[in-house]
Regions:
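Bacterial N-terminal signal peptides
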Residues: 11-22
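Single-stranded nucleic-acid-binding OB-fold domains
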Residues: 38-41, 81-95
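Periplasmic OmpA-like peptidoglycan-binding domain that tethers envelope proteins to the cell wall
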Residues: 182-249
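OB-fold (S1/OB) nucleic-acid-binding surfaces
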Residues: 38-59
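N-terminal secretory signal peptides that target proteins for export/translocation
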Residues: 1-9
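Short nucleic-acid-contacting surface segments enriched for D/E, G, S/T with interspersed K/R
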Residues: 63-79
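Structural detector for short beta-strands of small beta-barrel domains
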Residues: 27-42
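Periplasmic peptidoglycan-binding/tethering modules of Gram-negative envelope proteins
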Residues: 87-175, 189, 233-239, 243, ...
Length: 249
């Protein structure tokens, strides 16, 4: 076997520094915290603090954007990846990022930072696919993603359900198969959060109600709540909280 050349001490330090930087930028983070609002001259930014670092989550915006902002007076589960590039609105950017608002009231979550010269909100990014909420494999198969411990449907997920119904009606299909899943999330500190028992049933019941309300016959909705929970890994946990819809001929 051919041996690799021995690196000098200086070269080793340089390589370690480069690899260390790459690992930091690729690091996945998952933590629960109070969200922070940073006021700017244009629109507010949402930030979060973890282990002494401030992270940029996104701008306050409309329901059509992929990022749904947290709420003051509520803790939030932040799941994201540290992105390369300069700080944004005073924080290291997380992209992609998924935020899940916890329903319990916490009055301590009320920090609003004032406008500061040199700290600006980024311009609104061009509209893109709502990857935090919906992924489609063709017109007949769609996966909807959910906030932790929630059956809330965003504008994106509601629109996706409507399109599935249109596909069902246009193709004169026989059924729509619905499977709902309960997820879990591994925090960066090692704690594992498990969604409440029954959340998959709540999600499948809500989707069934919407489908039937849009004209799909009750007998044509084949709905299952999956009881098994995928083990969290701290990387792609947001995608374990889902409902799949498939139009069947």
């Amino acid at each position: 076997m051919k041996r690799l050349p021995r690196l000098s001490p200086v070269t080793r330090v340089f390589v370690v520094a480069i690899l260390g930087t790459s690992l930091v930028h690729a690091q996945s983070l998952s933590f629960v915290t109070c969200p922070i609002v940073r006021d700017t001259k244009t629109v507010p930014c949402w930030l979060a603090e973890y282990n002494g670092e401030i992270y940029y989550l996104g701008n306050q915006g409309g329901v059509a954007q992929d990022f749904y902002p947290p709420q003051l007076n509520h803790e939030v589960l932040v799941e994201g990846t540290i992105a390369e590039g300069p700080r944004v609105c005073g924080g290291a950017p997380l992209r992609p990022v998924k935020t899940s608002v916890f329903l319990e009231i916490n009055r301590a979550c009320n920090t609003i930072l004032p406008v500061e010269d040199g700290i600006e909100a980024p311009a609104r990014a061009p509209a893109r696919d709502p990857v935090s909420w919906v992924r489609s494999d063709g017109p007949s198969d769609t996966t909807l993603y959910f906030d932790f411990d929630n059956d809330f449907l965003s504008l994106h997920t509601t629109t996706a359900v409507q399109r599935i119904v249109e596909q069902f009606q246009q193709t004169k299909a026989s059924a729509i198969e619905v499977q709902a899943f309960r997820g879990s999330s591994r925090l960066s500190n090692g704690t594992e959060l498990l969604e409440q028992a029954g959340i998959a049933e709540k999600r499948v019941a809500k989707i069934r109600e919407i489908l039937e309300g849009l004209g799909v016959p009750k007998a044509s909705v084949r709905a299952i709540a999956v009881t098994d929970v995928r083990r969290a890994n701290g990387v792609d946990d947001p995608w374990s909280r889902k409902v799949t819809l498939s139009v069947k001929k």
